[in-house]
Amino acid sequence: MPSARLQQQFIRLWQCCEGKSQETTLNELAALLSCSRRHMRTLLNTMQDRGWLTWEAEVGRGKRSRLTFLYTGLALQQQRAEDLLEQDRIDQLVQLVGDKATVRQMLVSHLGRSFRQGRHILRVLYYRPLRNLLPGSALRRSETHIARQIFSSLTRINEENGELEADIAHHWQQISPLHWRFFLRPGVHFHHGRELEMDDVIFSLKRINTLPLYSHIADIVSPTPWTLDIHLTQPDRWLPLLLGQVPAMILPREWETLSNFASHPIGTGPYAVIRNSTNQLKIQAFDDFFGYRALIDEVNVWVLPEIADEPAGGLMLKGPQGEEKEIESRLEEGCYYLLFDSRTHRGANQQVRDWVSYVLSPTNLVYFAEEQYQQLWFPAYGLLPRWHHARIIKSEKPAGLESLTLTFYQDHSEHRVIAGIMQQILASHQVTLEIKEISYDQWHEGEIESDIWLNSANFTLPLDFSLFAHLCEVPLLQHCIPIDWQADAARWRNGEMNLANWCQQLVASKAMVPLIHHWLIIQGQRSMRGLRMNTLGWFDFKSAWFAPPDP
């Protein structure tokens, strides 16, 4: 019998006997474990061989045998739990232990670095599963980061300085304002072993032609081997950066036939997905990666929803308590903001916008927040921390305003906290705030109407590219803000847009109302090198490394 199964049977026997040694019979024990008399004898003999108990059998009718426990079920359960934890079998650990507080304590004690059989393993604790990693779909902040570890694209953007770098394409040139040429590396392999072909690249880029930022791509052809020509309907100075974004990452052209591709995707990036469940995401360094192989061999993201309620929740990276810590922090490039929905009569009403933005000002929200949140929140007066576009002007409550609807996407604890503060403030002005939570996909598509939306945005480097790109690619914003998005996109592509002025106009009209900038924090270990937090609150796994243990 496998050791794990035997351990489970012993724990069950110990629990049924309440851990007490006793006189009993083989039939009684077999009934407790719902097995045959013969199988029960085999179990007892095997458990005795393991040193967990003694079984002194008595022969004869009416005779009772002696069962003595030498090992407690709790001790064996702890040992079993440690084994499961070491094997990263979190699903089974949760089932075995049951108690969430105990599971959390065990997980936290095993965070950070592990060195096993010559392999460096990094364990990270996160507050929610990362089940959808499909490029081109609606991806949240953390899924966007993970996708960048799994997939490659024609180009990539350096997370630290925002500079454009080569990826699958080693060089590129602009032939004319409407014609770009990219030269691709041969010998690139997917995680499932197949070599990347030009058809994969062409297929991947054509599949995103329906997205607003890629809709100007007229044709994609390969005139010679490992050469890719992209023809546009309008000039785009940002095209090389656009092709380094997550939607433009390269998939195997047969991806739709591969099982559970969204949660177990196959790319050509530095890490391959090994496991992705509701309790754990495990990715492993790809030995055949065409670039420098990652120095951390394996990254395990353990999921514990309970940490979502902690203000500094999100990403937890801590080693043993006695180890020195290194804290990496930055003020996010982006903010929480209110979005007024022009499709509703209250969302389109300028008086309502003026008054709501006045009573729900950033300083009011921070003032009414608990101290633990005040330490992490910074009042926002622009979409970026350096901008001061919002002006707080006293405004009178519109006559007849009795209720408002606020909507945000679920699985985000700070949304609930901020919404609760808003509800409290508005109630003091005799306005009822109806709060709705919807899925991230529903939020992204924006088909549902709401007077106001509570959103958040994290912009990546370079900001003059990503700010407009991020806002333009969210359908909800295009539904709520009635401006000529296509004309603005054309000006942006031509380099004719003053981005600061454009954002200031959105803030001045109260279409968007900045609320809070959030401090992003990673607490790691001093033995970890190369940890540089990016604007998404994570770090590039392939660039981090651990100094090896002393010989």
Curated annotation (Swiss-Prot):
- Renumbered to this chain, region (Solute-binding) spans 163-492
InterPro entries per record = SBP_5 (IPR039424), SBP_5_dom (IPR000914), SgrR_HTH_N (IPR025370), Tscrpt_reg_SgrR (IPR023767)
The superkingdom listed in its UniProt entry is: Bacteria
- One Gene Ontology term from the biological process aspect of the record: peptide transport
**DNA-binding region(s): which residue ranges?**
26-49
Return the CDD domains for the record: PBP2_SgrR_like (cd08507)
Which keywords has UniProt assigned to this entry?
Answer: Activator, DNA-binding, Repressor, Transcription, Transcription regulation
GO function term, MF aspect, one: DNA binding
Q: What does this protein do?
A: Activates the small RNA gene sgrS under glucose-phosphate stress conditions as well as yfdZ. Represses its own transcription under both stress and non-stress conditions. Might act as a sensor of the intracellular accumulation of phosphoglucose by binding these molecules in its C-terminal solute-binding domain.
Entry's HAMAP family? HTH_type_SgrR
Q: What is this protein called?
A: HTH-type transcriptional regulator SgrR
Q: Which organism is it from?
A: Escherichia coli O6:K15:H31 (strain 536 / UPEC)
Q: Which gene encodes it?
A: sgrR
